[in-house]
Swiss-Prot record:
It comes from Campylobacter lari (strain RM2100 / D67 / ATCC BAA-1060). GO terms for biological process: protein folding. One of its GO terms (cellular component) is cytosol. Participates actively in the response to hyperosmotic and heat shock by preventing the aggregation of stress-denatured proteins, in association with DnaK and GrpE. It is the nucleotide exchange factor for DnaK and may function as a thermosensor. Unfolded proteins bind initially to DnaJ; upon interaction with the DnaJ-bound protein, DnaK hydrolyzes its bound ATP, resulting in the formation of a stable complex. GrpE releases ADP from DnaK; ATP binding to DnaK triggers the release of the substrate protein, thus completing the reaction cycle. This is Protein GrpE.
């Protein structure tokens, strides 16, 4: 009987050990699944941060370029004003020609970097134009541009300066 008792006890211990091992295995599997999930989420978050940083880098570069181009528009305005001054003698004509060449070169370089003049003819568009004042005009339909007061510019399809215009009532 003692041998049967021992066999029964061994079987009980084996079953108990087997249950303990199964419980331990389930715990380890759950812990593994949790760690795997945490890893996958952290990896996805890292990839999202990487993509966001790349977009912010591109955006910062574009903004810096837009800011620089916007600053150059004052130079364009000054050169255009100088070209529009009447030249009376040969020296003034030569200076005016040099200023015109400088203006043309600057405009080519701006265009190379996607800076374009906003069309300021036809119907007023509040997305592109800034109405400085409204005027009566027999020659223009209502809500159409009468006069360009200051050129507007776009860069990469974004307005860097609205065209300042007068608009027919």
């Amino acid at each position: 009987m003692s041998e049967e008792k021992q066999n029964g006890q061994i079987q009980e211990e084996t079953v108990e050990n087997s249950e303990n091992q199964n419980n331990e295995l389930e715990k380890l599997q759950a812990e593994y699944n949790e760690l795997k999930d945490t890893y996958l989420r952290a990896n996805a978050e890292f990839e999202n941060i990487k993509k966001r940083m790349e977009k912010e880098k591109i955006s910062a570069t574009i903004y810096a370029n837009e800011s620089f181009a916007k600053d150059l528009l004052d130079v364009v305005d000054a050169l255009e004003a100088a070209v529009n001054v009447e030249a009376n003698d040969e020296i003034s004509l030569k200076i005016k020609e040099g200023v015109q060449n400088t203006l043309d070169l600057l405009l080519k370089k701006l265009e190379k970097h996607m800076v374009k003049v906003i069309d300021a003819e036809g119907e007023f568009d509040p997305n592109l134009h800034e109405a400085m004042f409204h005027v009566e005009s027999a020659d223009h339909e209502s809500n159409h541009i009468v006069q360009l007061l200051q050129k507007g510019y776009m860069m990469n399809d974004r307005i860097i300066r609205s065209a300042k215009v007068s608009v027919a009532k």
